[in-house]
Amino acid sequence: MKFIDEARIEVIAGDGGDGSASMRREKFVPFGGPDGGDGGRGGNVYAIADRNINTLIDYRYAKKHMARNGENGRGSDCYGKGGDDITLRMPVGTVVTDMDTGELIADLTEHDQQVMLAKGGSGGLGNLHFKSSTNRAPRQKTDGKPGERRMLRLELKVLADVGLLGMPNAGKSTFISSVSNAKPKIADYPFTTLAPNLGVVRVGPSKSFVIADIPGLIEGAAEGAGLGHQFLRHLQRTGVLLHLVDLAPFDESVDPVAEAKAIVGELRKYDEALYEKPRWLVLNKLDMVPEDERDARVADFLERFGWDGPVFQISALTGQGCEALCYAIYDYLAEHSDAHRAAEEEDLAADVRFRDAPPSDGGATSGGDA
């Protein structure tokens, strides 16, 4: 299935039904009084996170989603039926934003998390409500309220603990396939990876973390070169970034230091917060460097790159150094996960508007069709 991580949709909640202006008509009851019922409420539109969905492709083509209107009230004190709700199933990690106001409506981070996107209109009042001691036969009634109508932007950000950065052919796909259960396409040409890949790395019976591989970046990605830099959004939820560098490029004219600096520059252009995220340097393809030259080549790279953070030397192809790197990642995540989660929850509490859950009897369900 094609990977789609962005879509724009319109959601329209149902209108409330109109109240009824009716009088009781019954044999031997000459002055029956008002008996007009209220209109039914309009249906709501909900989003629910589903871990079995991993793309927004349904919403790329089905752009309008409408809940049903409430029915009008009738005589004999009959209330109109409420409109059926609809539920839109979306991947875990979807962010929903109102395109007109910029309001963050929902951040779906957990399976089965449910959020109201548009509220149905309330039903109108029947003339039964307007009866008084001075007005025994009221003709007044009210119309139902219109439901909310919104243009929404859906943006999928994959949920991972670790993100991989690097130029095309830096060995990111080889690394993730070496340390996890992911099976990405691997080939000796650039841009083999066209969509994010997720893999689970296990360092013990109950110890694991999720790693995300995104398509490679090149210099000028911010201006649309290569595949652009839009896939960087999938690294925004990670706890640490691994910057993979090809220390032994096939083309001897390619300077690994210049390529590494270009990646950092593109990262900063895209998002300052992502640039400030903890980042580790991973020097890959050591198996391609003669053993007696490794120390000198690594030292030269670090000096010219000006790096003073964590450094790991690996060969993703042979597995050399990968186990130590994975254990270091797990220890770091275990130490920092509580603080990272608390900060994320604090941000969401300030921005995300959660609404009431739908009634227990529920309504219609949609997987992307209106």
UniProtKB/Swiss-Prot annotation:
Question: In which broad location class does this protein mainly occur, judging by the first location in its UniProt entry?
Answer: cytoplasm
Q: Which region ranges are annotated with the description Disordered?
A: 127-146, 350-370
Q: Taking every annotated instance into account, which residue ranges of this chain make up the domain Obg? A: 1-159
Q: Which InterPro entries match?
A: G_OBG, GTP-bd, GTP-bd_Obg/CgtA, GTP1-OBG_CS, GTP1_OBG_dom, GTP1_OBG_dom_sf, OBG_GTPase, P-loop_NTPase
Q: Which Gene3D superfamilies match?
A: GTP1/OBG domain (2.70.210.12), P-loop containing nucleotide triphosphate hydrolases (3.40.50.300)
Question: What Gene Ontology cellular-component terms does the record carry?
Answer: cytoplasm
Superkingdom of origin organism: Bacteria
User: In its keyword annotation, does this UniProt entry include Magnesium?
Assistant: yes
Q: Which family does it belong to?
A: Belongs to the TRAFAC class OBG-HflX-like GTPase superfamily. OBG GTPase family.
Please describe what this protein does.
Answer: An essential GTPase which binds GTP, GDP and possibly (p)ppGpp with moderate affinity, with high nucleotide exchange rates and a fairly low GTP hydrolysis rate. Plays a role in control of the cell cycle, stress response, ribosome biogenesis and in those bacteria that undergo differentiation, in morphogenesis control.
Q: What protein is this chain from?
A: GTPase Obg
The beginning of the lineage is:
Bacteria, Pseudomonadati, Pseudomonadota, Betaproteobacteria, Burkholderiales
Tell me the gene name: obg
